[in-house]
Amino acid sequence: MIARWSRGEADADSNMAEAILVDLAATVRRHPWWLARSRLTLELLGRLGVHSPSRIIDVGCGWGTTLEALELRGYAATGADISRQALNQLDHPGRSLVELDLTAPWSPLDDFQPFDAALALDVIEHIDDDAAAVARLGRLVRPGGSVIVSVPALPDLFNEFDQIQGHRRRYLPETLQAAFQDSGLILDRWFWWGSWMVPLLRRTRGRTRALPGDTPEATYARYLQLPPWPAPLIFRAAFALEQDRALAGSLKRGTSLFAVAHKP
């Protein structure tokens, strides 16, 4: 069952073409990047003391990669997204799903219980007013609850792939911190992730993969194509090897930034 908290009609395509969410789900769910982000997030939750069966809302759950990982770990997880089509694809008996637009007023159910943690993984870069979105995330958690946000990093890497996803920006630490400034949340720390990918993206920036007549999902799929085996194994190993360094805050740069905050 899908609950609806948002008021009015949300324009999901203004954030990312819904066809990308629907048509490429199977590809994304087995892609090393999304799987590695889910593993890092689960490890981070554990280090924050947020263990199963804590209640967690995954805002912008999209293809459901992290949502499924949370469920398998035993969390009481709720998936939230602006896209009704994406939610329909994830819907099955026993799963908690919510239609939620962080850019618009919303009204949780009368019996709403704040969550122990809220995730917004690669969400706020799609939103013009990212600070307002972060403040709304704070409304979802109980006092003492955690908010984890991840964003694409390094503005000089902004490229066609960002554009077709509806990204407004890539972040530096100071711009990510600014999004939390008046949110009512206390920003505890931030850290880089994906350091090993920076040289790869710098080497290919400025190149385009769109072909004449391409739909957004066709171009997106082209970006998701991996080199032949054993490249996928190497990618998984690279993410695994740097995970502890990322969580320790010892990476000096990365293609993503994570922020960890709590509600006082």
Where does each model-flagged region fall?
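Conserved N-terminal segment of class I S-adenosyl-L-methionine
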Residues: 1-121, 131-134, 220-228, 232, ...
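Short, glycine-/aromatic-enriched active-site segment of Class I SAM-dependent methyltransferases
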Residues: 25-27, 147-169, 173-181
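Feature marks short, surface-exposed loop/turn motifs that line or immediately flank catalytic pockets
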Residues: 86, 106, 155-157, 196
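A short glycine-rich, Lys/Arg-flanked "PGG" loop and its adjoining helix->strand segment in the class I
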Residues: 131-146
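Conserved S-adenosyl-L-methionine
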Residues: 185-195
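C-terminal helical/coil "lid" or tail adjacent to the Rossmann-like core of SAM-dependent
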Residues: 197-236
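C-terminal beta-strand of the catalytic ATP-binding
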Residues: 261-264
